Amino acid sequence: MALIPMVVEQTSRGERSYDIYSRLLKERVIFLSGEVEDNMANLIVAQLLFLESENPEKDINLYINSPGGSVTAGMAIYDTMQFIKPDVRTLCVGQACSMGAFLLAGGAAGKRAALPHARVMIHQPLGGFRGQASDIQIHAQEILKIKQTLNERLAFHTGQPFEVIERDTDRDNFMSAEDAKNYGLIDSVLVKR
């Protein structure tokens, strides 16, 4: 298990300690780090909803460093980002690959960014299934529907034609922060605050 730093604050009522992520949550900063999976998605969704209830007018900052992961878990986060009232600013630190890149692009228009040496990668959804031929066919049809949806949403967020997205996600497509900006996945490359 990773060591999580603690922050100690002095108040008029004494000292109070927080883990670093809880302290940053008070500043409306959420970290999406590691593989996108159901437990992580539930935590991110809960934090988004909590921050909306605290102040529905103030932006939320979502920092992303992820190799990607589960499409359904990622879509839970994405749909919540689109559903809540506050704008969600996205910032790639390190990498945003696969579902991580999709969530990066899903931030509020004009408020999506990456640090200069971040890497972004888009591709088609991965899937695998074993079983009876008819069940394999059902799962193949489902993954094609998911691919269609992801490509439609990427086209919407990037401004790229659907056909371009379809071509560019056929295989792993790695981009620098500047390339991701030119492609429309992000709006800016941040060097300094």
From Swiss-Prot:
Listed Pfam families: CLP_protease
GO biological process: protein quality control for misfolded or incompletely synthesized proteins
Record key words, sorted: Cytoplasm, Hydrolase, Protease, Serine protease
GO cellular component: cytoplasm; endopeptidase Clp complex
SUPFAM superfamilies for the chain: ClpP/crotonase (SSF52096)
Localization of this protein: Cytoplasm
E.C. designation(s): 3.4.21.92
Domain of life: Bacteria
Catalytic activity, as annotated: Hydrolysis of proteins to small peptides in the presence of ATP and magnesium. alpha-casein is the usual test substrate. In the absence of ATP, only oligopeptides shorter than five residues are hydrolyzed (such as succinyl-Leu-Tyr-|-NHMec, and Leu-Tyr-Leu-|-Tyr-Trp, in which cleavage of the -Tyr-|-Leu- and -Tyr-|-Trp bonds also occurs)
InterPro entries: ClpP (IPR001907), ClpP/crotonase-like_dom_sf (IPR029045), ClpP/TepA (IPR023562), ClpP_His_AS (IPR033135), ClpP_Ser_AS (IPR018215)
GO molecular function: ATP-dependent peptidase activity; ATPase binding; serine-type endopeptidase activity
Active site per the UniProt annotation: 98, 123
Oligomer status and interactors: Fourteen ClpP subunits assemble into 2 heptameric rings which stack back to back to give a disk-like structure with a central cavity, resembling the structure of eukaryotic proteasomes.
Role summary: Cleaves peptides in various proteins in a process that requires ATP hydrolysis. Has a chymotrypsin-like activity. Plays a major role in the degradation of misfolded proteins.
Similarity comment: family membership: Belongs to the peptidase S14 family.
HAMAP family found in the cross-reference section: ClpP
Name listed for the protein in its UniProt record: ATP-dependent Clp protease proteolytic subunit
Source organism of the structure: Mannheimia succiniciproducens (strain KCTC 0769BP / MBEL55E)
GN (gene name): clpP
